[in-house]
Amino acid sequence: MENNQKRQQSGMSRRSFLKVGAAATTMGVIGAIKAPAKVANAAETLNYVPGSGKIRSKLRPVHDFAGAKVRFVENNDQWLGTTKILTKVKMTSEADAGFMQAVRGLYGPEPQKGFFQFIAKDPFGGSISWARNLIAPEDVVDGAPEATKTPIPDPEQMSQHIRDCCYFLRADEVGIGKMPEYGYYTHHVADTVGLMTKPVEECVTPVTKIYPNVIVVMIDQGIETMWASTGYDGISGAMSMKSYFTSGCIAVILAKYIRTLGYNARAHHAKNYEAIMPVCIMAAGLGELSRTGDSAIHPRLGFRHKVAAVTTDLPLAPDQPLDFGLLDFCRVCKKCADNCPNEAISFDEDPIEYNGYLRWNSDFRKCTEFRTTNEEGSSCGTCMKVCPWNSKEDSWFHKAGVWVGSKGETASTFLKSIDDIFGYGTETIEKYKWWLEWPEKYVMK
């Protein structure tokens, strides 16, 4: 407790110092930074193209990238955004995802038991999670479209309309992408509890509805709540559940709306997935794959988001994948790896080949084990909390730092150092804590 108070006081004093004294330092370093050669040549490698220049949304005309230098990458078979595709990417079953492997007992009895407790043991997070069941049934996420198609505008205008619908429903970010085939699971887990005792093939159903477009809805988990959280306390799970539920509600409404217009549309959210969300995020121009290996970072929100998606055959004009320098940044930062409570995140310098593409090879078993058995709270979001790409404050100096961090490896080292100096991500700020903790409920039963 004493250490937390010291960190809090230190963090606040550093913020005050930064607000009055960091301008000259930051501007001086910005002027001195030069991107490495491989970054300078990236445009030729990735085939950068400018944005369309057309209005993307009447309610939100431009993305809020918090000052990051964002480049747009064309869609092709060799790259998904900045993720290099080496060979044909193999499609995977949802039954092989980390949490499902825990349910199957592949990580031992404690994570298997913990999966059914780790959210519910926090009364608030468990209540939000319960509400997700209301939008989980197949007849809620999917259904037959109207027999007659309603005349619709051209794909560009329809895409603008779809984004506006999502923003009206209180999405924080929205993206539209071309859906790669490997973005779908081969099989969807239809009987999670059954995985404990039954053969996998009796618990899954094949994914057969492969649509060409994906709409991704992103919800902010809450910056002030994150400031007050340790990253693995009681509110950690509830932050995720709130964003899962909210994005899921928007997705099922949007899918129903599209079906009413006469087009196929299926919602995908945390209680009923047939699609892989990191792939959807990258395809829809909302993030890049990070050092964690299975999570995508948004230029403004960092990890501080959850998403749902709608796959559809509605004619749409896709957004372009992003490059805001994350690969070079993650290569040198390693702050998530330094702070991971179960040492699950890789310290490797470079991504390695996995399943036909390049990613950092983190230990997903260790990650799942800690999240399902954590007795100090509910789940874990430490990597989210400490990541410098979370815009910790809506201020010029943090936006300047984000801009610097998107300029290459040398600049990335600077942003990470500034993040550390001013205590971002490692302090807990008590004045923003609004929830109750229930430590007696966090112990595994």
Curated annotation (Swiss-Prot):
Predicted to be exported by the Tat system. The position of the signal peptide cleavage has been experimentally proven. Keywords: 4Fe-4S, Cell membrane, Hydrolase, Iron, Iron-sulfur, Membrane, Metal-binding, Repeat, Signal. Its EC number is 3.8.1.-. PROSITE patterns: 4FE4S_FER_1 (PS00198), 4FE4S_FER_2 (PS51379), TAT (PS51318). Catalyzes the reductive dechlorination of C1-OHPA to 4-hydroxyphenylacetate with reduced methyl viologen as the electron donor. Monomer. This is 3-chloro-4-hydroxyphenylacetate reductive dehalogenase. It comes from Desulfitobacterium hafniense (strain DSM 10664 / DCB-2).
